[in-house]
Amino acid sequence: MKTDLYSSITEKISSDKFSSIFILVDENTDQFCLEIFIKKSGIKLFNKIIIASGEDNKNIDTCVSIWDQLNSYKADRKSLLINLGGGVLTDIGGFAASTYLRGIKFINIPTTLLGMV
């Protein structure tokens, strides 16, 4: 079992040959986590999708917004969605990825304890 998160992500991304990569963040993980994650993971090309933070935003309207943004960026079945955030973000991001075009691959990168369980 690997313990280096960043090398595991880099290995997964390079082995699957994704057509496009999307990173889902909220305003907090956009400000405090995204830059560090990008530098350490070595991801070069990606599209960023931002949603509002908070439990109130775990709803179908947020999911539709994610689907709309994936669609506008021309996401396809070989796209990858990386969910960088806490429990709300990983929940809604996982659901959105699982239901977009009958499911695209996603990786959860939890930033809170709740996001890890």
What name fits each language-model region?
Residues 58-117:
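Glycine/threonine-rich beta-strand-loop-alpha-helix active-site module
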Residues 1-80:
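ATP/NTP phosphate-donor binding region
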